[in-house]
Amino acid sequence: MTAPTRVVVIGADAAGMSAAHQALRTARRTGRELAITVLDKGTHTSYSACGIPYLMAGDVASAEDLVARSGDAHRDAGIDLRMSTEVVSADLSARTVTTDGGDVLEYDELVVATGAPAVVPDWALRPDGTPYGGVGTVKTLDDGASWLERFAEVGDGGHVVVVGAGYVGVEVAEAALRKGFGVTVLTRTRGMSMLEDEMSDLVNVGLCDAGIELVLGAEVTGLELDGDRVTGVHWDGGTRDADLVVVAIGVRPATAFLEGQVELTDGGALRPDPHGRVADHVWAAGDCCEVRRRLDDEWVFRPLGTHANKHGRALGDSLAGGSLTFDGMTDTSITRFSYGEVHLEIARTGLSRSDAEAAGHEPVALLTEGTTASGYMPEAEPIALWVMADRTTRRLLGVQVVGGHGAGKRIDAAAAVLWAGGTVDDLAWMDLAYAPPFSTAWEILQVAARRVAERL
């Protein structure tokens, strides 16, 4: 009798568990026998990290609501799941991994799905390497629970400084406002750097209208402390008192244990092939990886749950003898800022202007403003769309949206055209749904596309 293939998966969240379960499903179809062990240094598995800001805001009742599948459910499916178990080293030539408890596990196939922990700058850390009191990141369920405790401890009327104005920074700023705090957002850029300047400026106006103190071009230089607890933040242009400081400046792949054994990017990421392979008997998926952007064939670091789940599914299928592939993405993302009278849905897909120029395109882009519904309907809210196409080929290159209720998911129609390699004319003339509560007779996305088409 043939021994089962020993599969060790490092990481028990979206990519790792998607890979493990898909491998089991495919193995049943292909007649293979797998023995899958999943190791994770954390205490929670299969949870929505993207939902943590909404837990902090009070939209989500408890941290457990963010858990999609419990550890016992994974074990019942036939997976040997070991939580609170960190892999500290791997020997790819010997095909072994070593845990923090000293256990050495042999494998036939290794799946790296270690994710990407939040970056914490030196100014936020005590000499022992832990964050100062009142300072933290937003990445894990434990982080979310800690912020709820800190919010309750400080109480209404305190002040939160958020460092970083990306998606997480904006979402956390909303959460802090809704919990009764004053909020300052510090960013070294001119706003949301994933947007074009004119679109980022619209978001900046909304944040300020909601009562946020937004400081652009700010480089944090240190903290004001009382003992080892934060009381303020210093940057190159000023100081702000702070009861709490949220660091939201990005993440970095957890791949240090692989250095010198597989090729890593300068940022520490892996680049798996469409099946998920990075080397013989080594696979990878999720936030520890870069993904291929289909529009310009560039590898980019986009740690999103959508990519992690698809990546993991394709990997698991291929590992067990299937043929699924993860064929890249169009760089689509979305978020929301909603407080008081301000509601902004923020979305983008495709290339930026600088990306397009670097890829050799001659981009033509226009900003178009309109409403999310027919103007006579009470649902109608402002919306702005930025659309870009190539002057010669007419190929659609990028779309960005900032607007009120109903604005954000319009990005999906544009993403579909980009996925298919379509033109701005395809977007302008495709058949989209219309009724007055949902759009204007000429859908504003198509008006924006038509205006660009007329400039080519």
Features from the language model and the residues they span:
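FAD-binding core/adjacent interface of flavoenzyme oxidoreductases
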Residues: 1-10, 29, 67-159, 217, ...
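Beta1-alpha1 glycine-rich phosphate/pyrophosphate-binding loop at the start
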Residues: 2-80, 173-197
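Mid-to-C-terminal Rossmann-like scaffold of FAD/NAD(P)H-dependent oxidoreductases
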Residues: 2-6, 16-17, 290-405, 444, ...
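Glycine-rich Rossmann-fold phosphate-binding loop(s) that bind the pyrophosphate
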Residues: 11-15, 41, 139-140, 163-168
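A Rossmann-like FAD-binding core segment of flavoenzymes
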Residues: 29, 33-35, 75-99, 105, ...
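A short, polar/charged loop-to-alpha-helix boundary motif
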Residues: 405-422
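Cysteine/selenocysteine-centered motifs that mediate thiol-based redox chemistry or coordinate metal-sulfur cofactors
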Residues: 420-456
